[in-house]
C-alpha cells in the first residue's frame, strides 16, 4: 500500500526557455503559466524556467512577456518519467495587445474565459452545415431560432448586439435583430457571447455577436460554389445558390496590402407552393426580373482590404452590402412591442400574392480600422464605421397611392366568387355573407405601406495598458451620430382626392387611415474602463461602463413646445431626469461588470460573472405623434414618450469547464437573467391640434421578465480530421406579458393587469439539443 501511494504521488517537471524570436536573446521575467492550474513562474536572467510537482496530464502552456505576442502551446503532455523541455520564441508586437499565437491544435474548451462565449474560426465554420451567420449561431447552446429571428437565453430578438468588425450592423428600426447579412464563407472568426460580456460592449442586453471578416492571404486563391435542387423536379423548391470568393495579395505591395472579397446570391420559391407572378420593388423599379426572379431573393457582397506595417500598424477597410426582396412579413417586426408571433408567409393572400406586401431590405456597412502597439506596454485600437439601412414595404412595387381614387382597394370590402348566405331566415332581415374559403382573391391590395432608413456614424477607440504580467488595463469610448426616418401608413389610399366629375375633385384630406411619420437625429455612446487580473491561475476582470444618450432636438423641442401633445407628467419627468450639454438633453446609466475564474483542480475551472446591460427602446415609441403640426387623428393612434428609459438586464452566471486529455472538453453553466423596464402600452387622454380631448396609445417602462436556465456543451476531437460536438439547454422564460400591447388588451378586457402573476412567455423554448 505504501509503495502504491508513493508511485501515485510522483509528479512531473516542466522546464525550458523564453527567447526573442529574431535575435534569440533570452527574455528575463517572462511569465510562464500552465493554463487551468495554479502552476506559474517567471524566467530567470537567462530566460530559463522550471516548474516542479506537476500532476501528470495534458496541458496548455502560455508564455507572456510585455511588448511581445503571447504564445500558447497546446497538447503538452507532462509525465513523471522525465522532465519536459519547452522553448518559446516570442515575437515583438506591432499591432494590438493580447493577440495570442497558438501552437498545436485548438483546445476543445477555453479555460481562460470567465464567460459563456464561443469563438469559431472560418475553417471551423466551413465544416458546419451552414450558409449564413444565423445558421451557425442557431447551432449553439442558448440560441433559439424562430420565425422572428435569433433569441438568446429567452430574450427578445432585438436585444442582441450584432457587430461586424466591431461596428454595429443591426437595423435599429426593423425589430428583427439583424441588418447587414454576410455569408458564412466571408467570416474569419465568429464570436458569440451569451453571458459575461466585457465592459467594452454596451448595446445588447441579451448577447453579443461579433463577426470578423476574413482577410486576404499571402497567395492568390479563388472559389466557385453553385447549388441547386432542380435536378429532381419532384423535390424542387426552385432553389439556386451561387457564390464566388477571391483572396489575393495586391500586386506591387510586397504582400503587405491584401484583398478578400465574396459575392453570394440565393433564390428560392420556398415550400409554400403559392408564388407571385413577379415580385416588384419600388426601390428597384427597373428590371424586376433581374432583382427578384423568385419568391425570396437574397444578395450579399463583402470586400476587405488589409495593410500591415510594423511602423504604422495595421489598417483594414471593410464593406458589406446586402439586399433582400421577398414577401416574408417577419422582415419588418417589432416583436416584444406589439407585433403578433406569426409565421412570415401571408397565407390569407396566398391566392393574391401579386397584390401582397413585398419587402425590400437594403443595407450597407463600411468600417475603417487601425490598431497599433505604441510601445512595449501600450496598444491603441481605433475604428470608424457608417451603417445605412433602408426597408420598404409596399403593394408589390406599386406607388404609394394614385393621384386620385377611382376604385375600391380594401381587401375586406371586395367580395368575389362563391358567397354563402348565413342566417337567411332571420325575421329581422340580418343576413351575413360568408366569402368562400376566406382567402383574399378579389383584386384588393395590401393596406401596408412602410419606409424607414437608419444612418449611423460610429467612432470607437480603445487604449490597452499592461504595466506588468498581472494587470491588463483597458479603457475607451464609443459615440454614434444617428439619423432615423420612419414613414408608416395604413390604407394609404384613404384621404386621396376623388374625382366627382370632369371638373370637380375632392381635396386630399389625410395620408391614409392612420400614419406615423417622423425624422430624428438622436445620439448615443459610452465610456468604459476595466482591469484584467491574472495571478497564480486566478483570472478576474473588473469593469464599469458609462452609457449616455440624447433623444435629440426633435424630442427636446416637443417637450419645450406647450402646443405639442406631450403629457404634462412626461414633460416634467423628462426635464428632471436629464441634463443639458451641447444644446441637447442627455441621460446616463452605469453598467458594472465582473468576471472571475479559478482552477478547482488541474484542467478544471470554475467561473462566475455578473453584469448589467441595457437596450435602447425602439425610436417609434419615443417620437410618434410628437410634432404639433403633423399628427395622426385616427382612433388610438400612437403618442411618443420621449422620457422612455432603456430596457435593462441584470445577469448572474456560474459555470464549470473541464478538459479531459487533449481531445474532449465539457462545459456546464447555470444563469439567471432579470429583465426590467420592458415597455408596455397604456391608453392616455390628451388634446389634439384642435384642442379636443383624444385617446391615444402611449408606452411606458413597467414590465419585467425572468429567465433561468442550464446549458451544457461537449466538444470532442476523434482524430486529425473528425470533430464532433453536442450541446443542450433547458430554460424557463416567465413574465407578465408577451408584448407591449398585451397589457393594454388585459386592461381593456378586465380593467386591470395582474401584477403578481407571471406566465410562460410565447417565445419560451424549454428544451433544445444540437
Question: Which functions belong to the PLM regions below?
Answer:
Residues 288, 443-448, 455-458, 466, ...:
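Signature of Gram-negative outer-membrane beta-barrel scaffolds
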Amino acid at each position: 500500500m505504501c509503495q502504491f501511494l508513493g508511485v501515485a504521488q510522483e509528479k512531473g517537471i516542466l522546464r525550458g526557455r523564453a527567447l526573442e524570436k529574431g535575435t534569440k536573446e533570452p527574455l528575463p521575467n517572462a511569465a510562464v503559466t500552465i493554463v487551468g492550474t495554479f502552476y506559474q513562474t517567471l524566467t530567470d536572467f537567462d530566460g530559463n524556467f522550471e516548474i516542479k510537482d506537476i500532476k501528470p496530464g495534458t496541458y496548455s502552456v502560455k508564455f507572456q512577456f510585455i511588448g511581445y505576442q503571447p504564445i500558447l502551446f497546446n497538447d503538452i503532455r507532462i509525465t513523471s518519467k522525465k522532465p519536459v523541455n519547452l522553448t518559446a520564441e516570442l515575437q515583438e508586437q506591432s499591432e494590438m495587445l493580447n493577440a495570442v499565437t497558438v501552437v498545436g491544435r485548438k483546445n476543445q474548451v477555453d479555460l481562460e474565459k470567465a464567460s459563456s462565449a464561443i469563438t469559431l474560426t472560418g475553417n471551423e465554420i466551413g465544416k458546419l452545415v451552414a450558409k449564413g451567420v444565423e445558421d451557425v449561431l442557431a447551432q449553439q447552446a442558448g440560441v433559439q431560432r424562430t420565425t422572428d429571428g435569433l433569441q438568446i437565453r429567452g430574450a427578445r430578438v432585438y436585444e442582441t448586439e450584432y457587430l461586424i468588425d466591431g461596428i454595429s450592423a443591426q437595423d435599429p428600426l426593423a425589430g428583427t435583430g439583424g441588418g447587414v447579412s454576410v455569408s458564412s464563407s466571408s467570416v474569419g472568426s465568429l464570436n458569440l457571447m451569451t453571458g459575461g460580456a466585457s465592459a467594452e460592449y454596451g448595446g445588447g442586453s441579451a448577447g453579443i455577436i461579433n463577426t470578423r471578416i476574413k482577410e486576404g492571404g499571402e497567395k492568390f486563391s479563388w472559389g466557385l460554389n453553385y447549388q441547386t435542387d432542380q435536378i429532381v423536379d419532384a423535390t424542387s423548391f426552385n432553389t439556386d445558390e451561387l457564390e464566388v470568393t477571391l483572396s489575393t495579395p495586391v500586386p506591387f505591395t510586397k504582400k503587405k496590402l491584401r484583398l478578400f472579397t465574396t459575392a453570394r446570391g440565393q433564390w428560392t420559391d420556398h415550400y409554400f407552393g403559392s408564388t407571385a407572378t413577379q415580385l416588384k420593388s419600388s426601390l428597384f423599379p427597373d428590371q424586376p426580373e433581374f432583382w427578384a426572379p423568385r419568391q425570396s431573393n437574397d444578395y450579399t457582397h463583402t470586400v476587405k482590404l488589409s495593410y500591415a506595417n510594423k511602423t504604422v500598424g495595421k489598417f483594414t477597410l471593410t464593406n458589406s452590402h446586402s439586399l433582400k426582396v421577398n414577401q416574408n412579413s417577419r422582415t419588418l417586426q417589432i416583436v416584444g412591442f406589439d407585433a403578433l408571433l406569426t409565421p412570415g408567409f401571408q397565407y390569407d393572400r396566398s391566392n393574391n400574392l401579386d397584390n401582397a406586401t413585398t419587402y425590400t431590405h437594403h443595407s450597407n456597412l463600411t468600417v475603417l480600422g487601425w490598431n497599433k502597439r505604441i510601445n512595449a506596454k501600450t496598444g491603441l485600437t481605433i475604428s470608424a464605421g457608417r451603417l445605412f439601412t433602408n426597408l420598404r414595404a409596399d403593394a408589390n412595387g406599386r406607388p404609394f397611392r394614385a393621384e386620385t381614387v377611382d376604385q375600391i382597394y380594401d381587401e375586406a370590402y371586395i367580395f368575389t366568387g362563391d358567397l354563402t348566405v348565413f342566417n337567411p331566415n332571420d325575421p329581422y332581415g340580418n343576413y351575413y355573407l360568408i366569402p368562400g374559403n376566406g382567402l383574399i382573391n378579389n383584386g384588393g391590395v395590401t393596406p401596408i405601406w412602410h419606409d424607414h432608413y437608419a444612418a449611423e456614424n460610429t467612432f470607437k477607440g480603445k487604449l490597452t495598458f499592461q504595466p506588468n504580467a498581472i494587470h491588463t488595463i483597458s479603457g475607451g469610448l464609443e459615440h454614434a451620430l444617428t439619423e432615423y426616418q420612419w414613414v408608416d401608413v395604413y390604407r394609404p389610399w384613404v384621404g386621396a382626392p376623388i374625382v366627382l366629375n370632369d371638373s370637380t375633385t375632392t381635396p386630399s384630406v389625410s395620408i391614409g387611415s392612420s400614419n406615423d411619420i417622423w425624422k430624428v437625429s438622436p445620439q448615443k455612446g459610452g465610456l468604459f474602463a476595466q482591469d484584467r487580473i491574472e495571478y497564480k491561475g486566478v483570472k478576474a476582470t473588473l469593469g464599469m461602463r458609462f452609457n449616455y444618450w440624447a433623444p435629440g432636438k426633435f424630442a427636446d423641442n416637443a417637450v419645450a413646445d406647450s402646443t405639442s401633445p406631450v403629457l404634462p407628467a412626461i414633460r416634467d419627468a423628462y426635464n428632471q431626469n436629464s441634463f443639458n450639454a451641447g444644446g441637447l438633453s442627455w441621460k446616463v446609466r452605469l453598467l458594472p461588470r465582473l468576471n472571475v475564474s479559478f482552477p478547482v483542480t488541474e484542467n478544471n475551472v470554475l467561473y462566475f460573472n455578473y453584469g448589467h446591460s441595457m437596450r435602447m427602446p425602439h425610436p417609434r415609441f419615443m417620437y410618434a405623434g410628437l410634432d404639433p403640426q403633423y399628427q395622426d387623428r385616427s382612433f388610438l393612434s400612437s403618442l411618443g414618450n420621449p422620457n422612455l428609459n432603456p430596457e435593462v438586464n441584470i445577469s448572474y452566471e456560474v459555470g464549470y469547464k473541464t478538459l479531459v486529455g487533449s481531445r474532449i472538453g465539457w462545459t456546464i453553466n447555470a444563469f439567471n437573467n432579470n429583465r426590467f423596464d420592458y415597455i408596455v402600452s397604456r391608453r392616455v387622454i390628451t388634446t389634439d391640434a384642435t384642442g379636443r380631448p383624444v385617446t391615444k396609445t402611449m408606452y411606458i417602462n413597467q414590465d419585467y421578465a425572468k429567465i433561468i436556465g442550464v446549458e451544457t456543451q461537449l466538444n470532442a476531437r476523434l482524430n486529425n480530421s473528425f470533430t464532433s460536438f453536442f450541446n443542450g439547454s433547458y430554460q424557463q422564460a416567465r413574465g407578465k406579458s408577451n408584448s407591449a400591447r398585451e397589457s393594454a388588451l388585459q386592461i381593456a378586457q378586465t380593467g386591470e393587469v395582474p401584477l403578481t402573476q407571471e406566465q410562460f412567455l410565447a417565445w419560451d423554448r424549454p428544451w433544445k439539443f444540437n
